């Protein structure tokens, strides 16, 4: 038996769980900075559960599909600029330029507004900072969790400042309702699915 846990910096340990005398396996896949690096953790889980050959085969398929899509994006003659996420409270958490999502934008050959950022995680910024840098982005990608799909009226009602974005005005906002779509469950192990979607959005030709 073992307990699989995601480690967090400065967490001070695992409290009472450490006293159960059951081995703890730290699964740090979410800390990877490339989509394929994160997906490759399926090989570790394959070893753990005795299905290594199947896991290796699946990762090889994911890797092959991802590389093929990446090459296709490089052949595109057009590329949209992109900004992502929504304001949460007083901060807008944008993916760092070296984060998994930031590098996915790069592999999709999109012009990410914060591509020059050096963080590997999310970066909390003021709304004004995001608007100044990404207000003219061609495409805006948002994730949310709601009972029903968001509309432009919902975005405006949530925060009037959203209406100033070019992508809002041109109706070029793409949303993923994580209450209906298994985004967080699927994309860590099938980043090629997400890359394919990004390429279709950022290279409409």
Identify the meaning behind each predicted range.
Residues 20-21, 108-109, 169:
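Short, structured coil segments at secondary-structure junctions
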Residues 1, 15-19, 151-154, 161:
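Alpha-helical segments with a strong preference for the paired helices of cellulosomal dockerin domains
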Residues 64-65, 69-151:
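Flexible, glycine-rich surface segments
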């Amino acid at each position: 038996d073992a307990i699989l846990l995601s480690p967090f910096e400065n967490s001070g340990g695992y409290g009472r769980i450490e006293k159960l005398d059951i081995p703890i396996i730290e699964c740090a896949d979410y800390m990877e900075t490339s989509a394929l690096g994160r997906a490759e953790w399926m090989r570790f889980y394959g070893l753990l559960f005795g299905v290594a050959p199947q896991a290796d085969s699946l990762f090889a398929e994911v890797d092959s599909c991802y590389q093929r899509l990446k090459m296709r994006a490089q052949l595109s003659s057009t590329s949209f600029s992109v900004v992502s996420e929504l304001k949460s409270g007083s901060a807008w958490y944008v993916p760092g330029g070296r984060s998994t999502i930031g590098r996915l934008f790069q592999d999709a050959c999109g012009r990410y507004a914060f591509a020059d950022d050096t963080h590997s995680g999310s970066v909390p910024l003021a709304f004004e900072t995001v608007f100044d840098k990404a207000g003219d982005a061609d495409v805006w990608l948002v994730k949310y969790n709601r009972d029903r799909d968001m509309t432009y009226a919902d975005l405006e009602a949530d925060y009037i400042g959203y209406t100033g974005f070019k992508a809002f005005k041109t109706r070029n906002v793409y949303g993923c309702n994580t209450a209906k779509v298994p985004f967080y469950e699927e994309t860590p192990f099938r980043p090629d699915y997400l890359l394919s979607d990004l390429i279709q959005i950022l290279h409409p030709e």
